[in-house]
Swiss-Prot record:
Sterol-4-alpha-carboxylate 3-dehydrogenase; part of the third module of ergosterol biosynthesis pathway that includes the late steps of the pathway. The third module or late pathway involves the ergosterol synthesis itself through consecutive reactions that mainly occur in the endoplasmic reticulum (ER) membrane. It comes from the Eukaryota. Pathway: Steroid metabolism; ergosterol biosynthesis. It holds the Pfam family 3Beta_HSD. It is an enzyme of class 1 (oxidoreductase). It comes from Gibberella zeae (strain ATCC MYA-4620 / CBS 123657 / FGSC 9075 / NRRL 31084 / PH-1) (Wheat head blight fungus). This is Sterol-4-alpha-carboxylate 3-dehydrogenase ERG26, decarboxylating. InterPro entries: 3Beta_OHSteriod_DH/Estase (IPR002225), NAD(P)-bd_dom_sf (IPR036291). Belongs to the 3-beta-HSD family.
Length: 303
């Protein structure tokens, strides 16, 4: 079995070297910088890097399928179940409306992938929200840290916006489903050039979900224990911190409290999974509580 190969998305030559060596039948492109990274890095890796991968895949005669991972941030927020056809996407024409560079870069990369669909290379996009599960070293560990620092009884804003969430095993499963469908002559025309919403199918308030995580970790929070901080207050604090850091470090150091994170709390998403169910055969987790418990059992032993 081939060993892990590390290459930069900024290096066309290195990417082509990988394709020439391994001649992959399919590509699942999940790589992306952090949403907090610089504009230059995000556009270079997410847009130019995706373009480089598509070109390498297109010129490799063995490569027939390309699956790209997009984000909930690359479409405009919605609070009603929205289908792929009705979603409003960010692009070059409405770039000023994009909440941040990460959202725009993922949206532009998605357009490249869909446009590349052809009889030589079938392409598809899996759009995902926030992921949780075993081996998560970002979202869930942050919640564990807030528990240990006795901050888990606080919430920012009124928690009325709903968000989608996705168990990591289901995220992997959906990508594999799309890949297999693209490689199958009987299904590739249905899947090629299409994007699919994938989630647990259980939209809920962000802090409601967080409190389910806390409960599974042994630190339940009763409604009367919750302390709410107005979102506008935290947005102002975050903007002030960023300005102070910029003045004293010339932008070389970023504060842990970022305006982009606070603004995200005022977005949300709510999706219809009908298309993924109908075409890919995708089914979300049946018991979200069970996979949350499984996630926290691993997390509390690891962190």
């Amino acid at each position: 079995m081939p060993k892990l190969q590390l290459r930069s998305l900024a290096s066309q030559d290195k990417i082509e070297e990988i394709f020439e060596r391994f001649k992959p039948h399919a590509v699942i492109h999940t790589a992306s910088p952090s949403y907090m990274d610089t504009k230059k890095t995000l556009m270079s890796k997410n847009v130019d890097g995706t373009k480089a991968l598509l070109e390498a895949a297109r010129t490799c005669s063995d490569t027939k399928a390309f699956v790209f991972t997009s984000s909930d941030e690359a479409i405009m927020p919605t609070q009603e179940p929205t289908s792929e056809e009705n979603a409003h996407r960010y692009d070059e024409n409405n770039a000023p409306n994009a909440p941040n560079t990460y959202a725009l870069s993922k949206a532009l990369a998605k357009r490249l992938v869909i446009a590349a669909n052809s009889e030589e290379l079938y392409t598809s996009v899996i759009r995902i929200p926030g992921i949780y599960g075993k081996y998560d070293d970002n979202f869930i560990p942050q919640l564990v840290s807030s528990m240990r620092e006795k901050e888990h009884k606080m919430q920012v804003g009124n928690n009325t916006k709903v968000f989608e969430f996705l168990y990591v095993n289901k995220a992997a499963e959906a990508h594999i489903m799309a890949m297999k469908a693209l490689l199958n002559p009987s299904t590739r025309d249905q899947v090629g050039g299409e994007d699919f919403f994938i989630s647990d199918g259980k939209p809920q308030g962000l802090f409601d979900f967080c409190r389910r995580i806390y409960a599974a970790a042994g630190s339940p929070v009763r409604p009367e224990e919750v302390t709410s901080i107005p979102l506008s207050v935290m947005q102002t604090m975050a903007s002030t911190m960023e300005w102070v850091y910029w003045v004293f470090t010339l932008g070389t150091v970023q504060p842990s409290l970022r305006r982009i994170s606070m603004d995200h709390l005022d977005t949300g998403c709510c999706w219809s999974l009908d298309k993924a169910r109908r075409i890919l055969g995708y089914e979300p987790v049946q018991d979200q509580d069970k996979v949350i418990e499984r996630t926290m059992d691993w997390t509390m032993k690891t962190f």
